[in-house]
């Protein structure tokens, strides 16, 4: 009797938001220059909030580009690298759908370039990180994405909705996306 072998690829997604009081953008500058969260805590104290969001939906446009990059079919498009990846946030709570092409907010959405040295890979986990300073994205955070451009004109890999509060001036919020493949 032969053994049945199943092929599968599982992706586990974890979003984290670190919320800092940061009137002078000292924390945001430190993190944007590549300082670790642990170093920021030692230097500036604990964040006033830490949020975790599990899961998301992969968007068709991101899946298709990732497959083309893996196969060498597309060698010219921007990847989700330090040079071209942005984490985006918006205030829309429209349900996720694989056919969406980015954030759904009409006006309140913002994209932030990667903090220095991100994305990073450890074993089977990729991690993107961007820090939104005191004057960035001051609205309700309801939706999240990683995109390979500074707007939804790029290819969005995924989208997640989850209400995590309203960011205000004088605060810096660090958004982290981890995707683990197994």
Residue ranges and their predicted role:
Residues 1-141, 148-182:
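Small cysteine-rich, disulfide-bonded extracellular modules of the LU/uPAR three-finger superfamily
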